[in-house]
């Protein structure tokens, strides 16, 4: 009897080992080779990969070299700085080529018609890859940004009401209040002689305060520790992703992995405090629901699922959504505001043009009204041009979950497609000879191909759920600041864009503020 049990256990053990071995070989060898063969048959090649590391070492060396020096002046020809591997290999292999992230093949695609087809028509059979999900697992988890399939549909449906209709307009009051407080503080600081301001830091604080108040019923001061931890966690996760292509790397007790684990634990502890505080209000009878902001909608749904014995929307998912929107809701908008302020400070003619428009629409001392934001056409052009030159992300990734057809190209299941947004936004073929110059008028004189040439918020059903929120917020903040201050570039500003998940100014953006007479 005992011998039979031992034999059975041995069979199970050996079968499991063989299965794991086969899956590993399939994942890291058989599937990549199959994809490589299919793409080569279509004439799509790329730089020769090294065993295990693929092209990672080459990319890392090129990026390190190109970004090691600051720009010698303020210019916007930054594709070669941030995506030097794309520049080199697109010249050699054309508009389609394969790059290897370890043993993971990635198709770099810049043909805008094919990109539109992918984003508009194939969203149901494409999404985030396993490697992407692992890379952000400890940062934003499996929230909306990283979800796929039915999970994505459910989460999108759940969050959508917080970003539409009258509820969206209702957030304007908080945006105006938070911005007015910033103006008061800056006026006081400038009045005391501190007229140089690192505007990036101010924009991050401001957008963090706004997203806290509008989506989570909190404030930046309460969430200050959370935002600080999230910022460090973002950097550490970005640094750790370069090792993901090596099997088992995420389990190693490395310095990065230990620090990531500790930061994640602290972030989730702080989130639980915010969540529990909201739940306590409802349980103590202060409110019949958890509220109608994003956190309230998530908690209300969690209660429904609990009553239906459905555990899909558990506490971990709520925390993942909170991390996703804390990050996406303030980081990308803060960077949009930072780069736009830099561009306006460096282009006084456009700064004055926008200022005159704001005064014409709102009056010299009037506060922005959400119903009149559409009249700020010059400001809209400037914001679009800022998003074109400095999009929040340099790349837009998608993985094919089944074989699909893009034009004349067959995309095999398991192939990741990487869309170099920055390169598309700076393409002279698409935007003209002045593609690397600041020219907001390009968004007024002729229509632009949103969804193909211009994709700062992605496109199709999986576009950014908060883009209207972000644009409304940006217009309110910029309209307020430009009506109260004149800003010029400080001599201490060093132009050095870098990529840490998003495009950031390496040393911040220092501007000189001068209060305007009302």
UniProtKB/Swiss-Prot annotation:
Induction of its expression: By trans-zeatin and isopentenyladenine in roots. Down-regulated by auxin and abscisic acid in roots.
GO molecular function: heme binding; iron ion binding; monooxygenase activity; oxidoreductase activity, acting on paired donors, with incorporation or reduction of molecular oxygen
Tissue distribution: Expressed in roots and flowers.
Enzyme Commission code(s) on record: 1.14.13.-
Location(s) in or outside the cell: Membrane
UniProt main location, coarse: membrane
Keyword Ion transport: no
UniProt cofactor(s): heme
Family of the protein in this entry: Belongs to the cytochrome P450 family.
Descriptive protein name: Cytokinin hydroxylase
Biological source species: Arabidopsis thaliana (Mouse-ear cress)
Gene that this polypeptide is encoded by: CYP735A1
